[in-house]
């Protein structure tokens, strides 16, 4: 009889303990890491990703227009150091117009290729694990953009490079630069073999990141740019820091 009573008592204790554990668990915020002001780390992460995604959409839309790179002082693709001596040589012999066309077409290729960048960047954003959402939210104006760039640049380069290669041929940049390099090598007796595909890919990706950083900074500093409830809730937290 004592064993039965003891067993019933133990069962009651275990059931009571389970109920208490469930109550405690229900009070723990969802997501990993410490949140801020009642907003979970997971929700902060979602807000940061949404801001980055909006930055990509806005940046790609602007850069993908004619002169989106070429006449934007922040993102214009300039010649790499290796080709600056080629540019000077052409101008010295009266072929400045050919040099101008070569530079312009590098930017035209970026403008054409970047129209296909949005899904590539979006995939990188959505699959990115934000380990310190709180720290990023309370960081500098471009903290989320810098985090994305540091963790996805190689992935983005691999996915975006074929698009740039296609665009270089599409806009005629390959043809013009073959003429330029052939002319330069013939005149100087030197051999210059630039990897324009890799260079334009790198510069185009940098250009998108600059636009994303600008958008992130705007969302952080301008309440009017927080156009969704999630952005308002998450970035409202950094206003109180």
How should these model regions be labeled?
Residues 6-10:
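Hydrophobic helical h-region of N-terminal Sec-dependent signal peptides
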Residues 14-17:
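C-terminal motif of bacterial Sec signal peptides marking the signal peptidase cleavage site
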Residues 59, 129, 223:
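Residue-level signature of catalytic and energy-coupling elements of molecular machines
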Residues 139-159, 163-166, 170-241:
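Amphipathic, charged alpha-helical segments and their helix-to-coil junctions
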């Amino acid at each position: 009889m004592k064993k039965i009573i003891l067993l019933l008592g133990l069962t009651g204790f275990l059931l009571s303990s389970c109920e208490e554990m469930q109550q405690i668990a229900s009070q723990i915020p969802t997501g990993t890491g410490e949140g801020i002001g009642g907003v979970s780390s997971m929700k902060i992460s979602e807000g940061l990703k949404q801001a980055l995604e909006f930055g990509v959409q806005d940046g790609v839309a602007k850069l993908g227009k004619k002169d989106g790179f070429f006449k934007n002082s922040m993102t214009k693709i300039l010649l790499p150091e290796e080709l600056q001596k080629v540019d000077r040589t052409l101008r010295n012999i009266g072929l400045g117009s050919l040099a101008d066309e070569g530079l312009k077409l590098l930017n035209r290729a970026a403008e054409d290729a970047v129209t296909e960048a949005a899904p590539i960047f979006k995939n990188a954003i959505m699959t990115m694990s934000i380990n310190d959402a709180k720290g990023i939210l309370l960081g500098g104006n471009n903290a989320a953009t810098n985090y994305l760039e540091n963790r996805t640049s190689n992935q983005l380069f691999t996915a975006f490079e074929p698009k740039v290669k296609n665009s270089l041929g599409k806009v005629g940049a390959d043809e013009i630069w073959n003429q330029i390099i052939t002319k330069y090598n013939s005149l100087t007796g030197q051999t210059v073999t630039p990897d324009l595909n890799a260079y334009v890919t790198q510069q185009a990706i940098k250009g998108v990141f600059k636009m994303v950083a600008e958008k992130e900074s705007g969302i952080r500093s301008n309440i009017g740019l927080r156009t969704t409830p999630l952005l308002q809730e998450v970035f409202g937290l950094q206003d109180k820091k």
